[in-house]
Every structure is written in structure tokens, then in C-alpha cells.
Curated annotation (Swiss-Prot):
Protein name: 2,3,4,5-tetrahydropyridine-2,6-dicarboxylate N-succinyltransferase
Disulfide bonds: none
Assigned GO CC terms: cytoplasm
Reactions performed catalytically: (S)-2,3,4,5-tetrahydrodipicolinate + succinyl-CoA + H2O = (S)-2-succinylamino-6-oxoheptanedioate + CoA
NCBIfam families: dapD (TIGR00965), PRK11830.1 (NF008808)
GO molecular function terms listed in the Swiss-Prot or TrEMBL record: 2,3,4,5-tetrahydropyridine-2,6-dicarboxylate N-succinyltransferase activity; nucleotidyltransferase activity
Residue ranges that the Swiss-Prot or TrEMBL entry lists as coiled coil: none
Native organism: Delftia acidovorans (strain DSM 14801 / SPH-1)
Subcellular locations according to the entry: Cytoplasm
Highest taxon in the source lineage: Bacteria
Length: 274
């Protein structure tokens, strides 16, 4: 079934210029709808983990997400007295109290998750935003005004602090999703974008910005890397000298490895997860 879906999606992607809500083969619309539903219930995900820092990205699923926008018209959506005009309904729209309770997710108003995102049991959505294609795993808290971008992957027992932004893949178009692995703590107002991977058990301090072009400097080894924060790192914002000290440029600095003291200040509160 998956191979058949992939074949239909790949072919539709190659012919996407000819597609519209009024002019799309039935098998294409059904295939795209099937993928979005599978993303919504966690049966499919845009990327799957093979090991620490090792992920396989399923580009055909990302293509299906993009195609869904071409195949749908904007429609009126309502929430109380508020009107919206969009192509993607919210994840919990039309669900009963019992159905939402069965998901095991706590959703604090006015949090929004779009249909086609997955939020696992034990996760908490404070007033935040989870975009289509994103995956939020068990026990994770998405704190107030945090944004989980399209197709971003967030692991188990992660804390995304207030105002954190995880970049999406839809616009500007990115090849790979942003990934936060298990047991990470992302400090307030930090931004992780452009397919950067933060490996498991890492702590990103407040106000750290990491994209593919951001130098990630390890002060213990003197090494500079890009696009990946090694497992168990504690990262703060800083600067590196350039041009023989004439000026400095922004960098993310690995100041140490996570220790017991770090864990005590970034541990999750079980009382919030009862």
C-alpha cells in the first residue's frame, strides 16, 4: 500500500502544475487525503529515526503535504464568534470530549494544531501552534507562543520553552525537517531552523539561534560544526572572532556536556503531566 501511495504522490508531484481543486484525478486526491490522515493519527511521519542523529526523511510524504494545498480550496472555518478562511482544518475540530480525552493530550486554549500533525499521548500544548506534518512525541510540552513548524519532528519528553520556534519546510522550501530528539530542553525564544538536528539529551539556552549556516563551536575541543548539535550538549549564544579579531560573528557555543546540575534545572515537572 505504501509503495502504491508513494508512486501516485511522486507522479502527481511531477505533474503538479496541472493540478487544481477542480482538476485533479480522483486517485491523487484520495492518495493525498490518505497521507494527511495517516500523518494526523501518527501512522506515517515525514522522518523516522534510525539512531542518535540518524534520520531517514521520506520526501514523498512531504510532497503529499505540499500537494494538499494545491488540491484544496479555502473554506470558511468558525470558532465561536471568530471566522477563519483556510485550506487546513484544525486537528481537534469536530471531536467530542471523549474522543479528545482518548488521545491523552492536554490542549490549553487557544492552542492550535493543524490536521495532519500528530501529537502523542501525554503531550501538553500550551497556547502554541503546531503546523501540518509536524510530529510531537509523548510527554513533550510545547509552551506558550512556541511554534512547531511544518513537518518538524519533536521527540519524547522535550520541553519547548515560551516563544521557541522550530522552522518548517514549506516556505521557504527546505529539503529536510528540523528535528529535536528525545529529552531535550529548548530555552525561551530560541530558534532552530533549516533542518538542524538537536541530538538527544541536549540543552539549548535561552535566545539561541541555529540554522544551517550558524557555526556551532565546541569550546572543549575547538572544533566547529554546522547543522547538528551533538548529543548531551549544553549550548549558549556567543560570538567567534573573524579576520584576525577585526570583528566577531554570531555562533552557538557548546560550553559543556549535560551534567547532574544541568538536569536539575531543566527537569520536567511530573505534576503538570498527571
Amino acid at each position: 500500500m505504501t509503495q502504491q501511495l508513494q508512486s501516485i504522490i511522486d507522479t502527481a508531484w511531477d505533474n503538479r502544475a496541472s493540478l487544481s481543486p477542480a482538476a485533479a484525478p480522483k486517485e491523487v486526491t484520495e492518495a493525498v487525503d490518505h497521507v494527511i490522515e495517516a500523518l494526523n493519527n501518527g501512522q506515517l511521519r515525514v522522518a523516522t529515526r534510525e539512531g542518535v542523529g540518524q534520520w531517514t526523511v521520506h520526501q514523498w510524504i512531504k510532497k503529499a503535504v505540499l500537494l494538499s494545498f494545491r488540491l484544496k480550496d479555502n473554506v470558511l472555518m468558525q470558532s465561536g464568534d471568530l471566522n477563519f478562511f483556510d485550506k487546513v482544518p484544525t486537528k481537534f475540530a469536530g471531536m467530542t470530549e471523549a474522543e479528545i480525552a482518548a488521545t491523552g493530550v492536554r490542549v490549553v486554549p487557544p492552542a492550535v494544531a493543524r490536521r495532519g500533525s500528530f501529537v502523542a499521548k501525554g503531550a501538553i500544548l500550551m497556547p502554541s501552534y503546531v503546523n501540518i506534518g509536524a510530529y510531537v512525541d509523548e510527554g513533550t510540552m510545547v509552551d506558550t507562543w512556541a511554534t512547531v513548524g511544518s513537518c518538524a519532528q519533536v521527540g519524547k519528553n522535550v520541553h519547548l520553552s515560551g516563544g521557541v520556534g522550530l522552522g518548517g519546510v514549506l516556505e521557504p522550501l527546505q529539503a529536510n525537517p528540523t528535528i529535536i530528539e528525545d529529552n531535550c530542553f529548548i530555552g525561551a525564544r530560541s530558534e532552530i531552523v533549516e533542518g538542524v538536528i538537536v541530538e538527544e539529551n541536549s540543552v539549548i539556552s535561552m535566545g539561541v539561534y541555529i540554522g544551517q549556516s550558524t557555526p556551532i563551536y565546541d569550546r572543549a575541543t575547538g572544533e566547529t560544526s554546522y547543522g547538528r548539535v551533538p548529543a548531551g550538549s549544553v549550548v549558549v549564544s556567543g560570538n567567534l572572532p573573524k579576520d584576525n579579531g577585526r570583528y566577531s560573528m554570531y555562533a552557538a557555543i557548546i560550553v559543556k556536556k549535560v551534567d547532574a546540575k544541568t538536569r536539575s534545572t531543566t527537569s520536567l515537572n511530573d505534576l503538570l503531566r498527571d
